[in-house]
């Protein structure tokens, strides 16, 4: 059973949940992380123990929440889901922990956003399965230890570097999720289309995968939008031409760049001479949060060689200039003699 301790989900969230695989066998990609988890889960089940605490990190949309739910399904236990910003006070976390049952999975998304005070409650809970409760105030205050059922904490984060060392060290399993290949995404898109009762041609699935930035969440989102286009203008069949026409209207180019990707790169190239330029300066220039640029847009641009992150700031690469048809500037020549 899944219990979500977060605000109500939207219709798109509910639809996204129906597309998620329910077992490791159905989960596509992330072979290294999946293979390790399969071994750890089988070993824990064989010993009749709770799975060790798991930290999943990587760019958004790669399947961290899906893996957390699969872990619970494979272990045959309940999962309770929440997120770091929702847990504002130690009492909030204490209430969640005391309602867990033996071997339950507690999933905390954006775990890097837990406050330091809340983290302090987690340390003994993760290590000793105990909750330290302070009764009274001032000199008469005393601490009692409340035993907790053995549970598995699954934490997800896009910014593992922001986790404190004491918290990170308490995770027994740490897995990084990588961007997906075009072949993996095409398989996911075909599977999602089948679940949604849609007909999609192989070349249409491949083209959609190519423009999905290596991210299943984006692939499924674009699939839903292309489905609308196919339903209205193409008899409900998703072909290569349908995908190309629909994504042209959505301003998604052949590399998967959307409006914001183009804004980031063109701002660096046209306004700041290709860089280096600071992240906060870019954010101010395009009216976007610096955290959003760093977490959502930069990983894809950097991994695909369009952006460099240097100590002095962000720099557009030769590939970025060529993508937009800009002339690549010549590197400055050093002077032989000083004036």
Swiss-Prot record:
GO molecular function: ATP binding; ATP hydrolysis activity; four-way junction DNA binding; four-way junction helicase activity
Enzyme class: hydrolase
Keywords noted in UniProt: ATP-binding, Cytoplasm, DNA damage, DNA recombination, DNA repair, DNA-binding, Hydrolase, Nucleotide-binding
Chain residues that bind Mg(2+): 65
CDD domains on file: AAA
Entry GO terms, CC: cytoplasm; Holliday junction resolvase complex
SUPFAM superfamilies xrefs: P-loop containing nucleoside triphosphate hydrolases (SSF52540), Winged helix' DNA-binding domain (SSF46785)
Gene Ontology annotations of biological process type: DNA recombination; DNA repair
Residue ranges, annotated region (Head domain (RuvB-H)): 254-339
Region (Large ATPase domain (RuvB-L)): 1-180
Binding site for DNA: 309, 314
Region described as Small ATPAse domain (RuvB-S): 181-251
Reaction catalysed by this enzyme: ATP + H2O = ADP + phosphate + H(+)
Keyword rRNA processing: no
Database matches in PANTHER family: HOLLIDAY JUNCTION BRANCH MIGRATION COMPLEX SUBUNIT RUVB (PTHR42848:SF1), PTHR42848
Domain comment (free text): Has 3 domains, the large (RuvB-L) and small ATPase (RuvB-S) domains and the C-terminal head (RuvB-H) domain. The head domain binds DNA, while the ATPase domains jointly bind ATP, ADP or are empty depending on the state of the subunit in the translocation cycle. During a single DNA translocation step the structure of each domain remains the same, but their relative positions change.
Protein name according to UniProt: Holliday junction branch migration complex subunit RuvB
The organism's taxonomic lineage, starting at the top: Bacteria, Pseudomonadati, Thermodesulfobacteriota, Desulfuromonadia, Geobacterales
